[in-house]
């Protein structure tokens, strides 16, 4: 049955459901996000410290050692700072930071409880990314280090005063820039020269923590049925084909987002550690013939208010059923069943990513466990589906990111069948069903008892075949849409509160208190019969309404 939508095309601006900041570019982070970032990556511990609080030199040494992934606990504390005793709780970190060359060893005292100044913080950052020799060559402390920090692009928004104490919030902001900066190495040197080199992408994160990052679009997660490859449970798929295990329950609603994903290999799997999601402009177009058209790199949405053009970027990324695709024609850009999601990643009013999801619904009649052949219920719209469901070496069957077990393929289960441009096929299977009386129908779907369900565009039945007041078992696909309805006889028991008899030719309706305690209004078929209070006479709905308009009766 094809669903008739009276509201034209549905344009849905998807709300951001993830709980992290909106900026996804670069390494600059506000203090609150930087704290979450370092804690998620297990680099710095989560601390309840006010952003305005000052940072001591001992605190800075602890942070430096953790960021440079040095094992401070095993380092020898040789005691050359007179004010840092070997039994001091910060001694290991202080002497390790000095050994790494981030703090100098020239002074007899370290002053662990003194506030770290802004200029000192900049010097520490410069030393951590390998710019110390270059900074000394450019004038030394503080001017040479300030120049080096500016060259490394970590100074924006950071004060450089030699007397002012750096706040905890500014310190975290500086550290977030530092761990994202490319490291500087000495390529060659002689008595009168030093040559430096930068390897793009080689940072503190990659070098010391083996943490990688990728900026791109999340095109799938494990809740989706059809992807470009089989997903493991609790995983996300990026548009570069990278699959990341997602063990954080807070990272939901990522599909369609342009994100920076930080991940690390653990036990042979890339595990998602942290996500920064950008607040993209996202519009979803639901398939309905005549609602919108596509031509000349733009979608044209037609409604009662006229025509609206949604322009695509000339080099927009197009993914059809989870697979990157080139040379797509207009027929694919306008799926008969499914939806098109448009994503404007940089808010320039042109959509950079197009996610096309197209599927067909099928209902299993039987499944042969030995041959692997799936026999479908007959439907005029399923002939092509039957053809490409014939088992072959290119067919992959998945369910919510996992391979389907043969026990999942049973009669009356619903398949959502997806096909990619390369010819591969993916299926999701749904064994969901709901039973109840059809209490009403409208443009959006059917009301079953107290709940409403949309009807799939290529369902097996039409609305004209359904009768209000009848009891059905409805087969649902993975999107909770009705695909088929099977009539069943069912005895309902309840307490009639009132009848209503509309004028004209409308159906008599009964307000019934059900056994669950809810009140449901049921339309009554003209053929229905009800017993009177003595259980003797059988009356039609119209006769009963006239006779018992304000009475209450127990009926079954």
Feature locations, PLM:
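Feature responds to low-complexity, polar/acidic, surface-exposed segments characteristic
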Residues: 2-92, 99-165, 179-251, 255-262, ...
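Acidic (E/D-rich), amphipathic helical modules within compact regulatory domains
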Residues: 46-51, 55, 66, 72-108, ...
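Short, flexible, surface-exposed loop segments at domain boundaries
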Residues: 169, 173, 180-392, 396-556
């Amino acid at each position: 049955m094809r669903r008739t939508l009276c509201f034209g095309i549905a344009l849905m601006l998807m709300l951001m459901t993830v709980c992290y900041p909106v900026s996804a570019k670069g390494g600059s982070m506000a203090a609150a996000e930087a704290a979450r970032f370092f804690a998620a990556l297990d680099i710095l511990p989560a601390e309840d410290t006010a952003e305005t609080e000052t940072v001591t030199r001992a605190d800075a040494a602890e942070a430096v050692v953790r960021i440079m992934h040095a094992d401070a606990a095993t380092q020898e504390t040789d005691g050359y700072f007179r004010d840092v005793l070997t039994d001091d709780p910060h001694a290991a970190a202080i002497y390790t930071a000095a050994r790494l060359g981030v703090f100098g060893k020239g002074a007899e005292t370290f002053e662990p409880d003194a506030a770290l100044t802004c200029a000192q913080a900049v010097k520490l950052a410069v030393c951590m990314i390998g710019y110390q020799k270059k900074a000394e060559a450019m004038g030394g402390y503080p001017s040479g280090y300030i120049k080096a920090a500016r060259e490394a692009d970590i100074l924006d928004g950071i004060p450089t005063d030699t007397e002012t104490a750096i706040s905890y919030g500014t310190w975290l902001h500086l550290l977030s820039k530092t761990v994202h900066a490319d490291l500087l190495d000495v390529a060659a040197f002689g008595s009168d020269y030093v040559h430096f080199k930068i390897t793009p992408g080689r940072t503190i994160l990659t070098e010391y923590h083996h943490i990688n990052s990728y900026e791109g679009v999340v095109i799938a997660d494990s809740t989706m049925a059809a992807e470009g490859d089989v997903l493991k449970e609790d995983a996300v798929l990026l548009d570069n084909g990278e699959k990341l295990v997602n063990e954080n329950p807070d990272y939901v609603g990522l599909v369609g987002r342009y994100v920076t994903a930080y991940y690390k290999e653990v036990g042979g799997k890339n595990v998602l550690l942290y996500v920064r999601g950008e607040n993209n402009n996202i519009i979803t177009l639901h398939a309905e013939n005549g609602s919108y058209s596509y031509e000349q790199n733009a979608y044209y949405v037609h409604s009662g208010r006229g025509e609206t053009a949604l322009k695509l970027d000339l080099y927009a990324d197009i993914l059809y059923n989870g697979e990157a695709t080139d040379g797509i024609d207009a027929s694919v850009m306008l799926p008969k069943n499914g939806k098109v999601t448009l994503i404007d990643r940089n808010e320039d009013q042109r959509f950079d990513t197009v996610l096309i999801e197209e599927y067909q619904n099928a209902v299993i009649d039987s499944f042969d466990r030995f041959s692997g052949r799936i026999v479908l219920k007959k439907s005029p719209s399923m002939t092509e589906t039957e053809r490409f469901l014939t088992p072959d070496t290119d067919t992959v069957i998945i369910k919510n990111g996992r391979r389907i077990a043969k026990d999942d393929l049973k009669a009356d289960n619903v398949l959502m069948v997806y096909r990619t441009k390369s010819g591969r096929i993916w299926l999701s299977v749904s064994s969901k069903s709901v039973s109840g009386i059809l209490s009403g129908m409208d443009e959006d779907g059917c009301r079953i008892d107290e709940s409403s369900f949309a009807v799939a565009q290529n369902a097996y039945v039409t609305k004209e075949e359904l009768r209000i007041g009848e009891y059905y078992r409805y087969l649902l696909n993975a999107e909770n849409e009705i695909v088929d309805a099977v009539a069943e006889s069912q005895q309902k028991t309840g307490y009639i509160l009132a009848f209503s008899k509309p004028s004209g030719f409308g159906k008599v309706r009964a307000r019934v208190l059900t056994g669950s305690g809810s009140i449901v209004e049921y339309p009554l078929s003209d053929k229905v019969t009800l017993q009177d209070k003595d259980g003797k006479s059988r009356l039609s709905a119209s006769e009963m309404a006239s006779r018992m308009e304000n009475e209450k009766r127990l009926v079954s």
